Amino acid sequence: MEFQPVFAGAEISIINTLWYLIVFSILLLAVKHYAWGPVKDMMEKRRQKVIDDLDQAASDRKKAETLANEREAALKNSRQEATQILSDAKSNAQKTGKQIVSEAMAEASAIREKAKADAAQAETDALNEAREEVADLSVTIAEKVIAKNLSAADQKDLVDQFIKGLND
């Protein structure tokens, strides 16, 4: 087996190789001196921006979680408040209903008592008026009896006429 060079037709000389190495080294030094600093700065800025963006994203995620928890707590609190308001409204409605019923009962009782008192007063007034009329009639009958001396039959007729006059 014979070794064949890759570039069979090309002659590689050491001087050319050294020259290429020197030119490549000079080019590398020029790139390092002129371009490496700005490229390195650009890469560092990019790295810092990525870090800042990741930190901002984490911060935003934490804020979003906090807001979601606050909203959930507020919603739960709102539900509890709504339940409490409904409970209070029912309680107030029941109290108001009971109060209205008790006031109506008290008013009805007062009206009944007043009606009883009015009826008793009317009865008393009617009795007093009847007594006065009976007294007046008695006086009138007595005057007539005294004015004329009546027989028993005349007196009976006179009383009957008087009673008939009361009915009218």
Swiss-Prot record:
Organism: Lactobacillus delbrueckii subsp. bulgaricus (strain ATCC 11842 / DSM 20081 / BCRC 10696 / JCM 1002 / NBRC 13953 / NCIMB 11778 / NCTC 12712 / WDCM 00102 / Lb 14)
Xref: HAMAP family: ATP_synth_b_bprime
GO MF: proton-transporting ATP synthase activity, rotational mechanism; proton-transporting ATPase activity, rotational mechanism
Pfam families xrefs: ATP-synt_B
Transmembrane segments: 11-31
Similarity-based family: Belongs to the ATPase B chain family.
Membrane topology qualifier: Single-pass membrane protein
Compartment annotation: Cell membrane
Gene that produces this protein: atpF
Subunit-level organization: F-type ATPases have 2 components, F(1) - the catalytic core - and F(0) - the membrane proton channel. F(1) has five subunits: alpha(3), beta(3), gamma(1), delta(1), epsilon(1). F(0) has three main subunits: a(1), b(2) and c(10-14). The alpha and beta chains form an alternating ring which encloses part of the gamma chain. F(1) is attached to F(0) by a central stalk formed by the gamma and epsilon chains, while a peripheral stalk is formed by the delta and b chains.
Principal location class: membrane
Function: F(1)F(0) ATP synthase produces ATP from ADP in the presence of a proton or sodium gradient. F-type ATPases consist of two structural domains, F(1) containing the extramembraneous catalytic core and F(0) containing the membrane proton channel, linked together by a central stalk and a peripheral stalk. During catalysis, ATP synthesis in the catalytic domain of F(1) is coupled via a rotary mechanism of the central stalk subunits to proton translocation.
Protein name (record): ATP synthase subunit b
Keyword set, alphabetical order: ATP synthesis, Cell membrane, CF(0), Hydrogen ion transport, Ion transport, Membrane, Transmembrane, Transmembrane helix, Transport
Example of a GO cellular component annotation carried by this entry: proton-transporting ATP synthase complex
NCBIfam families per the UniProt record, alphabetical: ATP_synt_b (TIGR01144)
